[in-house]
Amino acid sequence: MRIAFDVSPLSHPLLGIGNYIQGSLAGLAEAAAGEHEIVAFAPTSMRGPGRIRAALAGIDVELRTWRLPFSHALRTGWSRAGRPAAEQIVGPFDVLHFSDWMFPPQRSGVRATTIHDLVPLHHPEWTTARTRAMHGRKYRNAAATCDLVFVNSEFTGRDVIETLGIAPDRVHVARPAPKKVFTPDGRAAALGGPYVLTVATLEPRKNLQSLVEAHRLLGGDLLLAIVGAEGWGEQPLLDDPRIRRLGYISDEELARLYRGAVVAVYPSRFEGFGIPVVEAMACGVPVVVSSHPSLDEASGDATVRADPDDPTAIAAAIERAMVERERLRIAGLEHSRSFTWRAVGEILLRGYDEALVR
């Protein structure tokens, strides 16, 4: 089997979707064990090939990239124009898997995609106009043309079936896993005092305002460390000297921060899965998570849950997590081990195989 896999999101610093693509390809290459050919391809920006090579280092795939001026506009145009067929770009294939908002045209073979969430449809106020337009086109194309739709959770799977009208037998759940760097073993960060850690792009959906208010209610010398890229929309006030804004950091730095935290908090109002929850567990830190059902699978029975819109409840959950630290640490480590990228790769291969014989 020859699998063409779109990796154009790896042209940018790795966030949730980029990490999912990187892990999926690692798991797919491991599960394929040399029996299948995997071509990772991307029409990308001038700096994109270097970033993509770095993201896929050590993963057994053939890489094909093309530097393009105005690459974003050209990828959009390619998707909407319906030509040229992807076969003319990457050669013949049995499966084409596109991974984010780009949906390349193809002449034959299995057509597959991954949908991470339907936030732009359910909560347009939490997204930009550009995001709504791009993902709206992708959702419509996936529903109309894809043989396979992979999702990152049962929650997203049900949402895709109910909202987009995609047949259940076309939907396959492939839950993400923490990277190997996220382990309880290794150095822990020190920020000059005990700290609560949150990992999120600064955008309304991540609900940092409620966490900032909860942190203020806790008082004392407890710091709040915020890791994540710049986002958009209304931002919380971060001028408290007890708040440390750390920005976008490497996985190695993030693992050290997880290990050093007294509690990790993920107060998001809506997720596809919520991989930072599992990353924190894998590093042995107790976790407080929003009670929204989209986070049930990442949480399992190994977190303290709280109403994301109630800062008092979040503050109480943080205090409880500190008291129950050892129980949550053990439960979280066990739960995090149930997720592997090898399992994701096996799910992808099984889906491709089933679609090829239909």
Each language-model region and where it sits:
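Carbohydrate transferase catalytic cores enriched for Leloir-type hexosyltransferases
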Residues: 1-358
